[in-house]
């Protein structure tokens, strides 16, 4: 796949981390999550691990429309930010976004199924560099990169205050 603004470099997941292909990730975020989880007002995205990346198939509903027939850029940015956040978690890092760059390459229509992928590119101390994209078929609609700051494992309570994290391989 040819990228325009991102590298596509994917950091290996430590085998001892407990995270494996096929694991569904929605349960680790609180019910208040805007993008994933079981909040009825959310996008209800269902991300899982696939080939060292966080992956989801998703059709943006009409309620996420910006321009006529197109997904609002803020919605696309939120989806990518959330997915990149999940990508830090599968490396056992609990982090927050420090910098987010989104490149809108071609319009993203509502009511069409897309693949959304996110991954960690590099970890440098507390800085975690991530990349993500939204694509249909082999066309990339949106590319994104971000820098997250690792808050440390004690931040688990912030991300999942009502979950027993020991049950989800952390």
Segments and roles (model prediction):
Residues 1-57, 62, 164:
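Non-catalytic linker/capping segments at the edges of enzyme domains
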Residues 48-53, 63, 70-95:
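Active-site helix/loop of acyl-thioester processing domains in fatty-acid/polyketide metabolism
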Residues 82-115:
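Hydrophobic beta-strand-centered segment that forms part of the acyl-chain substrate-binding groove
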Residues 102-137:
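Hydrophobic beta-sheet segments that form the core/acyl-binding groove
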Residues 128-129, 137-144, 149-152:
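C-terminal binding/interaction regions
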Residues 151-159:
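A short, polar/charged loop-to-alpha-helix boundary motif
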Residues 168-170:
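Conserved small/polar residues in nucleotide/adenosyl-binding loops
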């Amino acid at each position: 796949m040819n990228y325009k603004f991102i590298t596509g470099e994917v950091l290996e997941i430590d085998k001892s981390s407990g995270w494996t292909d096929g694991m569904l990730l929605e349960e680790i975020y609180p019910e208040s999550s805007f993008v994933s989880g079981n909040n009825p007002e959310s996008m209800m995205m269902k991300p899982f691990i696939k080939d060292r990346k966080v992956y989801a198939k998703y059709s943006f509903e009409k309620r996420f429309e910006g321009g006529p027939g197109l997904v609002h850029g803020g919605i696309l940015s939120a989806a990518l930010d959330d997915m990149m956040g999940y990508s830090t978690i599968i490396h056992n890092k609990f982090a927050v976004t420090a910098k987010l760059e989104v490149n809108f390459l071609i319009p993203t229509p509502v009511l069409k199924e897309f693949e959304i992928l996110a991954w960690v590119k590099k970890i440098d101390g507390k800085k975690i560099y991530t990349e993500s994209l939204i694509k249909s078929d082999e066309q990339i609609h949106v590319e994104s990169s971000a820098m997250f700051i690792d808050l440390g494992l004690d931040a688990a309570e912030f991300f999942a205050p009502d979950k027993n994290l020991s049950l989800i391989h952390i």
